[in-house]
Swiss-Prot record:
Main location: nucleus
Record protein name field: multidrug resistance regulator 2
Stored CDD domains: fungal_TF_MHR, GAL4
DNA-binding region residue numbers: 11-37
Amino acid sequence: MTKRDRTIYSCDACRSRKIKCNRQTPCASCHKSKRDCVYTVSRQRDAQITNRKLDKKTYHQISAIEKKISALEGKKGLLQVETINFNKSFTDQTPLVELQSLFPYLLLSKQDPGCVLVRHHCHHLLEKDPRYFEYSQLLADLSLTKRHHLTARAKALLGEAYIPSPQEGHTIDQLKHVLSLNPNFRFAGNFADPLTSFFSLIPPAWANKQLVDTFFQHIYPVIPIIDETDFNTSINRVLGPQIDGHYINSFPSIGSADDLPFLALFLLVLRISYMYTPGACPVSYDTLRAAETIMKEFDITKTHSLTALQAEIMLRFYKIVAPESYTQSNYVQVSVGVLIQNCYSLALHRDPEYIGEHNPKQQHLRRKIWHLLLRMEVIDSAIFQTILSSNPDASDTKLPQLIDQAPPMEQSIVKHIWRSTDLFVSLRKLVEINSKTSEDTPLETVLELLVEVETKLQAFLATIDSEASTVFYNDLVIFSVNFLLVYMYYSLYLFKGPTPLGNKYLLKSAQILFVDLARTRSTSLFLAYFNLNYIHLVLMITNFLRMRVDCIIHRHLRAQDSSVQDLQCCRYFLKIIFFSHVKELGNYSSSHKYAWQMRKVYLTLAKIMERSSDVLISNDPELVKSAAVDIPVKEINKLLEQYINFKGFTPTTLFDPTDNELIDEMQHENLWNAMENIEYSEKVYSGWIDAIKNVPSNWDWDYWDFLKIS
């Protein structure tokens, strides 16, 4: 028989003396005799008896180990979990603010010790010349004689295509005539009264049919928010009959208020399609301005129709990716927020089945619009670090379903929405952590989420097929996810500092930037916007690294250490990459305003970095010392050399331009100044506000805010 494991109710002292115990703590007997009152269960008592039988040495060893275990278990609860906040300084935990991001991920420039030196130096330069960043450094030092010579030569070379500078005193009509020689910037009609001049703004009917077909064949997969059949039906109803491919009406047929946003939507579809495939029958820039004029009639405080929401989404899409636009984070934040709130007012966050919508086509359309906007704001947040406006917990809208006998393109779009859903769910969690300011996040949570996003990205890539209709959508997802991964891993490197783990994060960020993203290519006009953001990311990171390398070389030379060969090689590679991309921005500047704005900033930084010793002298030695920490230079050199070979870059110069290069630079500057003057002078105001329309607009950047350290 085995003994029963009884529970002991008497304390050890009373049990050993075989007296009655009142079972208190302490019991009456122990209290009276001032003894320790201990209640030991039978198994523990057996262990005590066993311990007595052991030799004293072994017993003391076991007791010491038990005490250490108890002490460690006590400390375990006191250990602090390592946390991170991406919106606070990693050195002193002060809040970091970037009120108006000129370019994506500028918060990194306030975290990186090397770039902090550059920001301090730029601040000193701006104190001397507040407009230091506002002009091209290639043109800044030109003498008046040289400028006159270049202007005369440009007029001789370009003839009518020469774009005059604001100082040459041309009228707005003369500027529009010159710019109209560029197919992207044709002007036509009175966009301030889009109904009266509607048919003068658009091409003939035969050309419009081709443009609409182009939209649904190539652009629709990226922004599938309209139904092709309904759209073509509305075109015929509103624009009226045709004879020999030309409209015969002189005024659109407006049957209801909903036809106004349809006209704006139609104008935007034409302009987007033309920018995708410029042809013999151009769609003027005024079609965009006419669409904007129409949409101003829809007050954001009122509930809109679904058609108005579609037009708003299309307008926002165009303004972000259009070559003549320049998008900052404040516009991205406000515009997507308004769209999300309009979706709530139209109940798009509730599944159509639950609100009495039984038309399968409308159900499908409403679901696509809602889930497209959810993805759109996550992509915006991943790139511009904007705050999410939607609440997925308040939505029960199902994913779009595959429809029997649907066109292959529509089936492919639905499949890609399903395939990318898991990835966007994880990406959303990551951007929420990135934008969190009120509390820190456990570092382990961030690392687990990064692994999850990378795993799901690879799973998404494995599902990609060769269908041309979905190429843009795939690239859009790949770009936005990898952009954020570069930012997050580089932030983790700055957080961990010069440690083996920190260096691992630096190499991970560099691998994605210089290898994974370098292989993502697209010739789409609309993805040129993402290509430009990629160039910005490369320029920003290479500038950080170059300043850090200069600081390390400075430290070695002061210590009379001549072993800087790898560091000098790294600086050489970084300079090749930086100069080559700044030159590439010059090629983009003839058609993309964003590229021109970016080129001015990075030309200035290139000029500053050519005299990096001035940066070191103008900064506190302790700041220089903090930037002079070692980096895994050999591993970085391999990635940089591989990137240079892949891109075909060769050593080039920036600050010894030929006359033709200077003429190009002047023409780019004149182009965007002329566009700004035209837009400002012809801006459409309400009648009561016309009296103050001559007040200068505040369109320039606030460089002082840009250079604030915190």
